Amino acid sequence: MARLAGVDLPRNKRMEVALTYIYGIGPARSKQLLEETGISPDLRTDNLTDEQIAALRDVIEGTWKVEGDLRRQVQADIRRKIEIGCYQGIRHRRGLPVRGQRTKTNARTRKGPKKTIAGKKK
């Protein structure tokens, strides 16, 4: 089983798909990475040689922030926005959607379950 950036890649998936299991690498970056290293996207993870794994590791570590470093960076960015009190930071602090979505209805993922209020008597 190949291990890159602290993640065990699934055994018999195509490399193009297996690389997306690493936080910070999506489909587009996965294709770009495979082109840079000259590895076929159709190659299965089982069939990787040690040299190919080393080449992938070098490109990933030298080029991008992935996994723990990227998660820490995202958390630090959110903390910074909260500290400076910008609009996005306020939305994060209140647990509301940050990117302009409506909140009169929906937004249940960010707001949590409904808080039922007693109805008006007739």
UniProtKB/Swiss-Prot annotation:
Residue numbers spanned by region Disordered: 95-122
Gene3D superfamilies: 1.10.8.50, 30s ribosomal protein s13, domain 2 (4.10.910.10)
GO terms under biological process: translation
Signal peptide positions (record): none
Cellular component per GO, a single term: small ribosomal subunit
Keywords, sorted A to Z: Ribonucleoprotein, Ribosomal protein, RNA-binding, rRNA-binding, tRNA-binding
Lineage top rank: taxon: Bacteria
One function term, GO molecular function aspect: tRNA binding
InterPro entries according to UniProt: Rbsml_uS13_C (IPR027437), Ribosomal_uS13 (IPR001892), Ribosomal_uS13-like_H2TH (IPR010979), Ribosomal_uS13_bac-type (IPR019980), Ribosomal_uS13_CS (IPR018269)
Role according to the record: Located at the top of the head of the 30S subunit, it contacts several helices of the 16S rRNA. In the 70S ribosome it contacts the 23S rRNA (bridge B1a) and protein L5 of the 50S subunit (bridge B1b), connecting the 2 subunits; these bridges are implicated in subunit movement. Contacts the tRNAs in the A and P-sites.
HAMAP family for this protein: Ribosomal_uS13
Database matches in PANTHER family: 30S RIBOSOMAL PROTEIN S13/40S RIBOSOMAL PROTEIN S18, SMALL RIBOSOMAL SUBUNIT PROTEIN US13M
Family per similarity comment: Belongs to the universal ribosomal protein uS13 family.
Subunit structure: Part of the 30S ribosomal subunit. Forms a loose heterodimer with protein S19. Forms two bridges to the 50S subunit in the 70S ribosome.
Protein name stated in the entry: Small ribosomal subunit protein uS13
Phylogenetic lineage: Bacteria, Bacillati, Actinomycetota, Actinomycetes, Mycobacteriales
